[in-house]
Amino acid sequence: MNNQLKYRLNIIWSDEDNCYLVGLPDFPSQTWVTHGDTYQEAFKHGMEVMEELHLAVVNGDIPSPEIITVKPEKVSAQ
């Protein structure tokens, strides 16, 4: 598994589908790309899809997504 991938991966529970759905928002052509019965399974499947999409970018099969960088905000204890 490539730990250097810089894409976002969203995992949500779906009552309708009774499973976790995985989305890759940096790839707008992909909505919900895979799923899993457990959070861990959904994450594993999501990473597999992400690696395949990354290879497609490297090979020039699909355009490179615009990477959105999020800077964490400092939160002070009150």
Residue ranges and their predicted role:
Residues N2-L5, L9-I12, G23, G36:
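DNA-contacting interfaces and partner/effector-binding or oligomerization modules
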Residues M1-R8, Q30, K44-Q78:
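Short, charged, surface-exposed hinge/linker loops at domain edges
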Residues Y7, N18-Y20, Q40:
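Short secondary-structure boundary micro-motifs
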Residues D26-E41:
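A short, exposed loop/beta-hairpin motif centered on an aromatic-Gly-Thr core
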Residues I12-Q30:
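Short aromatic-glycine-(Arg/Gly/Cys) micro-motifs in beta-strand/loop hairpins
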